[in-house]
């Protein structure tokens, strides 16, 4: 497992792959308990079907959330997912299709260490303003301020030193980068700008 008790553990399951077009069913039994001795067991059936690289495997929704600067969801698109593509590759394609320029570090390919640093698009930050309550909390906590960015771009170190883009999938923050994550059919990936 990776992670910790505080943040939650993550496990990677590796099943032997069936031939292309075939499928295999696996049963996973999960037993978990807490410090008080309470326990629960869940059984999950996983159907593993192999498809060829590049084949269409479903749809996902990608959102861009700039609520922390008062803009809410600035874009939301349904995208096709291709077998073998990382979340980073899918996100970059969506951003390009929607007219964004993405500044990033690393590579979008699997295990490429991808980090989304900045999004740029004309008037992206038009009417942006950090909500007063959030700004008060940032100042109260002594977070180092850096100043507001220009009108067309939002990214790392804008407003505060801890600011940047994070992502969640279906409300869960994976403990790995976008180039280590693969999207599944029906997933909702949110790119969320944070200030701390």
What is the role of each PLM region?
Residues 1-196:
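Ubiquitin-like/PB1-type beta-grasp interaction modules and other compact soluble beta-rich domains
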């Amino acid at each position: 497992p990776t992670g910790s008790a505080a943040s939650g553990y993550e496990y990677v399951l590796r099943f032997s792959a069936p031939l292309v077009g075939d499928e295999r069913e696996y049963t996973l039994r999960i037993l978990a308990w807490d410090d008080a001795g309470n326990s629960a067991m869940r059984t999950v059936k996983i159907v593993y079907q192999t498809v060829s690289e590049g084949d269409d495997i479903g749809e996902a929704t990608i959102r861009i959330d700039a609520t922390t600067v008062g803009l809410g969801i600035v874009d939301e698109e349904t995208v096709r997912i291709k077998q073998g593509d990382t979340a980073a590759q899918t996100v970059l394609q969506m951003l390009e299709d929607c007219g964004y320029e993405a500044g990033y570090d690393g590579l979008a390919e699997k295990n490429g260490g991808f980090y989304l640093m900045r999004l740029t698009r004309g008037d992206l930050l038009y009417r942006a303003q950090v909500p007063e309550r959030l700004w008060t909390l940032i100042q109260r906590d002594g977070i180092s301020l850096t100043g507001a960015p220009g009108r067309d771009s939002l990214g790392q170190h804008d407003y505060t030193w801890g600011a940047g883009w994070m992502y969640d999938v279906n409300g869960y923050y994976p403990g790995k980068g976008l180039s280590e994550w693969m999207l599944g059919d029906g997933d909702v990936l949110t790119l969320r700008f944070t200030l701390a």
